[in-house]
A protein has these predicted regions:
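A structural motif corresponding to the C-terminal lobe/cap of the Radical SAM core domain
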Residues: 101, 125-149
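Conserved AdoMet/S-adenosylmethionine-binding subsite of the radical SAM
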Residues: 1-114, 119, 125
Length: 161
């Protein structure tokens, strides 16, 4: 997030009545969120995992930093947690429940589940790179049990978004 450059732009847009939104994974210094939050009406916040080791191994992110930024954003404006559901990474009941509880503990009330897809496979081939995750694409129907789980915990859960 390029917060020092983005904050004045967001402020100008917000002053003109333009709806402002930021998509983030939350792996950024807290001061960045402090700069942009006053001018942001919606954060689309990627939450990939709730286990520190798994999150760090795959994304390099610090779960404490992500959680602190998620809490900060949720206390100030609307936040939708977006959970990419990825086979072999976060696709078990325990992992999904952990993600939902993590989101709830940081003030999030809305979660959108995003089914894993392989749309980037062709780009990797053109770059001569291996597509690391060779798993089948998930459908909306595959995510219905996770949607029901999220709702049972008190979340407004959706698929897609």
């Amino acid at each position: 997030m390029q917060a020092p450059a983005l904050a004045p732009l967001l402020a100008s847009l917000a002053a003109q009545g333009v709806h402002t939104a930021i998509e983030t994974c939350g792996a950024a210094p807290a001061e960045n969120f402090a700069l942009v939050a006053p001018h942001t009406r919606l954060f689309l916040f990627d939450v990939k995992h709730a286990e520190e080791e798994k999150l760090r191994a795959v994304t390099g992110a610090d779960i404490a930093e992500v959680g602190a930024n998620l809490s900060f954003a949720a206390a100030r404006t609307e936040v939708i947690a977006r959970v990419p559901v990825i086979p072999g990474f976060n696709h078990t009941e325990a992992e999904m429940e952990g993600i939902f509880r993590f989101a709830l503990s940081h003030g999030v009330r809305r979660v959108d589940l995003l089914p894993y897809h392989t749309l980037g496979r062709g780009k990797y081939a053109k770059l001569g790179r291996e597509y690391a995750l060779d798993a089948a694409m998930l459908t909306k129907e595959d995510l219905l049990p996770w949607k029901a789980l999220g709702e049972s915990l008190g979340l407004d859960a959706g698929i897609g978004g």
